[in-house]
């Protein structure tokens, strides 16, 4: 079984080596790892130097460079299209964050998860899930969004906004075949809605969500406003097409 790992990255040259250093102990060296990198030139160079050292050890790692900050959704979508064009026979594609919030343990667990699904979401809100290091206000906001968005979109999941996901080959093909309405983090909600409408199977598994290793969140006020507008756009179009 071949699994591709896609990691969107924005100036995370410090945290990504920590994440990959632990992950590659249990990652098949022949399975591709694609870094969708929107970092500035300094961060990009440091990242490339580290990734080259992993290539020298035999790991199959590639970088898909963005000239600007494309937003998470656009970066991952481009990496998916690259995977579909260059590694056509893969079984699954996993998306995970570069900042250390997604544990390598959970990535490996989802890779090896035996129950078949088209979209497998690592959820922060199942019985055995945990969130480490979040303030009460951040928990409340996340919990609210993950209640209201699935409710309005009629998707039975507990965590529609987390970016730790495993896609079947079919799901990756489908989400790359349409023109998305949004970018950034709200793209995750749009993507789940599209997969549901294609009558593909969505499942969740519990994960432990960790604090980012370095720095603070790269999500800006502009990103949040854009996400809210994107959600309204998805909801409006979803209702109009019913």
Task: Annotate the PLM regions.
Residues 1-3, 14, 18-21, 25, ...:
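Hydrophobic helical membrane-anchoring modules
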Residues 2-3, 24-34, 59-61, 91:
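Short loop->beta transition adjacent to catalytic acidic/histidine clusters or analogous donor-positioning motifs
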Residues 61, 66-83, 92, 102-183, ...:
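Acceptor/aglycone-binding surface of glycosyltransferases and processive sugar-polymer synthases
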Residues 10:
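A short, exposed helix-loop element centered on a Lys and neighboring polar residues
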Residues 30-41, 64-66:
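Short beta-strand/loop segment that forms part of the nucleotide-sugar
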Residues 50-58, 82-90:
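Alpha-helix termini
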């Amino acid at each position: 079984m071949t699994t591709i790992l896609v990691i969107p990255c924005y100036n995370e040259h410090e945290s990504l080596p920590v994440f990959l250093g632990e992950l590659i102990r249990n990652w098949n060296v022949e399975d591709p790892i694609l870094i969708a990198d929107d970092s500035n030139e300094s961060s990009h160079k440091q990242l490339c130097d580290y990734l080259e050292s992993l290539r020298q050890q035999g790991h199959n790692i590639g970088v898909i460079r963005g000239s600007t900050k494309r937003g998470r959704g656009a970066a991952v979508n481009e990496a998916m299209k690259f995977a579909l064009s260059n590694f056509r026979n893969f079984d699954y594609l996993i998306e995970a964050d570069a900042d250390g919030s997604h544990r390598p343990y959970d990535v490996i667990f989802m890779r090896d998860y035996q129950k078949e699904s088209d979209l497998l979401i690592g959820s922060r809100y199942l019985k055995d899930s945990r969130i480490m290091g979040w303030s009460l206000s951040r928990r409340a906001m996340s919990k609210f969004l993950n209640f209201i968005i699935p409710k309005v979109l009629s998707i039975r999941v507990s965590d529609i906004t987390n970016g730790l996901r495993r896609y079947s080959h079919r799901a990756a093909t489908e989400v790359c075949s349409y023109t998305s309405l949004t970018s950034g983090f709200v793209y995750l909600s749009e993507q789940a809605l599209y997969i549901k409408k294609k009558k593909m199977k969505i499942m969740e598994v519990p994960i432990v969500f960790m604090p980012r290793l370095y720095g603070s969140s790269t999500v800006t006020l502009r990103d949040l406003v854009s996400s809210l507008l994107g959600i309204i756009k998805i909801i409006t179009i979803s209702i109009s097409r019913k």
